[in-house]
């Protein structure tokens, strides 16, 4: 895989476990690319993935009528008859 970089790249030195380095070398050989290119790809892919939405933690946490969102003013300010 040939990756063309339009933006500037920054040199970065990292420490990596030997077993991960070996696995990276095998995968780089298999894909006919460099270990550095694989690392750039993996990091970019990981950072592009959206994290979990914190609002999802609240789903199902509250008890009430099914249409509360339709009458939010009534719930917050009380019903005006």
Swiss-Prot record:
InterPro entries in the record: CopG
Function description: Antitoxin component of a type II toxin-antitoxin (TA) system. Neutralizes the toxic effect of cognate toxin VapC20.
Keywords, ordered alphabetically: DNA-binding, Toxin-antitoxin system
CDD domains: RHH_CopG_NikR-like
Name of the gene this protein is made from: vapB20
Gene Ontology MF, one: DNA binding
Protein's name in the database: Antitoxin VapB20
GO biological process, one term: regulation of DNA-templated transcription
Organism: Mycobacterium tuberculosis (strain CDC 1551 / Oshkosh)
């Amino acid at each position: 895989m040939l990756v063309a970089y339009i933006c500037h790249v920054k040199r970065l030195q990292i420490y990596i476990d030997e077993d991960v380095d070996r696995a990276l070398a095998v995968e780089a050989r298999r894909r006919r690319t460099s270990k550095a290119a694989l690392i750039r790809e993996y990091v970019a892919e990981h950072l592009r993935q959206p994290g979990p939405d914190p609002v999802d933690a609240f789903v199902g946490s509250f008890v009430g009528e099914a249409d509360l969102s339709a009458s939010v003013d009534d719930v917050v300010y009380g019903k005006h008859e």
